[in-house]
Amino acid sequence: MTFKINSKGPVLVTGANGFVASWLVKRLVEAGVTVHGTVRDISDPRKVTHLNQISKKGPGKIKLFQADLLESGSYLDAMKKCTIVFHAASPFIIDAKRINNPQKDFYDPIVNGTKNILQTVDDTKTVKKVVLTSSIVAVYGDLNECLTPPQGMLSEKDWNKTSSINHIPYSYSKTMGEKL
């Protein structure tokens, strides 16, 4: 399958080391695109080794930038000259026992982080398109919603209505982040 993208400049992939974002980066590099990828800690080999290996295979290339979703302005350098922003950065915690503070662990980075990205887009005149990576959990919050799905095709009117900051906070935060 051929992956084509119409970009006259580099593109930004936030959270480039994440699972979905890494596959996107790989396909973009294979298509010859220059990718500006953001990672929270570019000195951590666990976060960047696989990205450097992708870049070596080309024909596109990756330039890594350190950025934090909650730090205003931290995406400015990474976004310079980019024409498309793929916002894929998002925390994801599988083990519920590791969720100490749903507001801090999910809501702030997902919702306020998305606001930060969109504000930086507004400040970057070269960006023409933003692609937000969301999740099915923005539509289906818990089992009750899965058991009573909307009829027909899903649309922008179909939202997760059962999650809250205290009940499935990841789903709630993804819903609120997408609603921006």
Predicted regions and their residues:
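N-terminal Rossmann NAD(P)H-binding glycine-rich loop of SDR-like oxidoreductase domains
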Residues: 3-35
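Conserved glycine-rich Rossmann-like NAD(P)H-binding loop of the short-chain dehydrogenase/reductase
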Residues: 33-44
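A structural signal for isolated positions on well-ordered beta-strands in alpha/beta enzyme cores
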Residues: 34-36, 63, 131
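NAD(P)H-binding glycine-rich loop region in Rossmannoid oxidoreductase-like domains
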Residues: 42-112, 122
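Conserved cofactor-binding/catalytic machinery of classical short-chain dehydrogenase/reductase
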Residues: 71, 113-116, 176-177
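Conserved Rossmann-fold NAD(P)-dependent oxidoreductase catalytic core, especially the SDR/UDP-sugar
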Residues: 87, 91, 96-170
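Active-site YXXXK catalytic motif of short-chain dehydrogenase/reductase
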Residues: 170-178
